[in-house]
A protein has these predicted regions:
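C-terminal helical cap(s) of enzyme catalytic domains, especially alpha/beta-barrels
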Residues: 222-226, 264-284
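Catalytic cores of alpha/beta
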Residues: 140-151, 189-198, 239-258
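Glycine-rich phosphate-binding active-site loops on the catalytic face of alpha/beta enzymes
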Residues: 147-167, 204-213, 253-272
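Glycine-rich active-site/cofactor-binding loop and its immediate structural neighborhood
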Residues: 79-136
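Active-site mouth loops of central-metabolism enzymes
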Residues: 72-90, 132-140, 181-185, 234-238
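Conserved, mostly hydrophobic/aromatic
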Residues: 25, 73, 98, 148, ...
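An N-cap/entry alpha-helix motif that binds or orients negatively charged groups
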Residues: 18-86
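Glycine-enriched alpha-helix->loop->beta-strand junction motifs that scaffold or abut catalytic
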Residues: 102-103, 128-131, 150-156, 176-180, ...
Length: 284
């Protein structure tokens, strides 16, 4: 098993005439992943991965969606476009509160340079809750799947804009081999078609183009109309009120990833409970 993760890194994106922000992030990610691979204690990572039984990210969302909106609460400290989002940042505490407030799952940022995240945040958050957790990062190498499961992840993110169909398929296969579910992120009609063609069953729509970091709010409502499979759809942006959730549910979304709108609130869990229109007590 050890040798399997010493393969060369995948090519993460097509070369364009002018480098984009996504290209910059992917290049940095590849460099960091290669450094971690070179220093990795594979037997220890494999033992940690084996000790974590994936909790079924997609199954958890479907169960929640059967009786209401399935919320993926995101534990996010910062972003390249917004800078520091939350200074008072305690992932285990946030995880417990989000679970108590009704989150169906968690998303934890693990990119350090651009989002001030870490695998340690993921591990700490995952260890404190029963609901499944997503490793949200720029996945470019099979090794990251081992890291994800070893850190308590139950699912990983694959961003269509970062990959060819070949690398999407390869990384998807590796995630499934590791027992991890996949949230496949798209931001235009072509990417949706690619994600569906490759058989992804959980597809998220992000209105932010990661190549330019510009936002097109109308994408969330427009793209779902072009869905041609039974994939579960996740709205990943533009959600700030219960009315927003109702609007997106009406056009076909069942799950909702909410990050900044919650993390900027004095009490993120109370804000989540308000979105879900349910009562919440701070006494855990």
């Amino acid at each position: 098993m050890q040798g399997r993760f010493r393969l060369p890194c995948f090519r993460a994106s097509k070369i364009e005439l002018m480098p984009t922000k996504l290209d910059e992030i992917l290049a940095n990610t590849l460099m960091e992943v290669n450094a971690r691979k070179a220093a990795a204690d594979y037997p220890a990572l494999e033992r940690k991965a084996a000790a974590h039984t994936p909790r079924g990210f997609v199954a958890g969302l479907r169960k929640a969606a059967a009786s209401g909106p399935a919320i993926i609460s995101e534990i996010k400290k910062a972003s390249p476009s917004k800078g520091l989002i939350r200074a008072d940042f305690d992932p285990p505490s946030l995880a417990r509160m989000f679970e108590a407030a009704g989150a169906a799952a968690l998303s934890v940022l693990t990119d350090g340079r651009f989002f001030q995240g870490s695998l340690e945040y993921l591990e700490a958050a995952s260890a404190t809750v029963r609901i499944p957790c997503l490793r949200k990062d720029f996945m470019v190498d099979r090794f990251q799947m081992l890291e994800a499961r070893a850190s308590g992840a139950d699912a990983i993110l694959l961003i269509v804009a970062a990959h060819t169909d070949e690398t999407l398929s390869d990384l998807g296969d590796e995630a499934r081999r590791m027992g991890l579910d996949i949230l496949c992120e798209v931001h235009d009609r072509e990417e949706l078609k690619r994600a569906e063609g490759l058989g992804f069953k959980l597809i998220g729509v992000n209105s932010r183009d990661l190549r330019t970091f510009t936002v097109h709010p109308e994408l969330v409502t427009e793209l779902v109309q072009w869905k041609t499979t039974d994939a579960m759809m996740v709205a990943e942006s533009g959600i700030g009120t219960a009315a927003d959730i109702a609007k997106y549910r009406a056009v076909g979304y069942e799950a909702f990833l909410i990050g900044e709108a919650l993390m900027r609130q004095p009490d993120p869990a109370a804000a989540l409970a308000m979105l879900l229109e349910r009562e919440y007590s701070t006494e855990l």
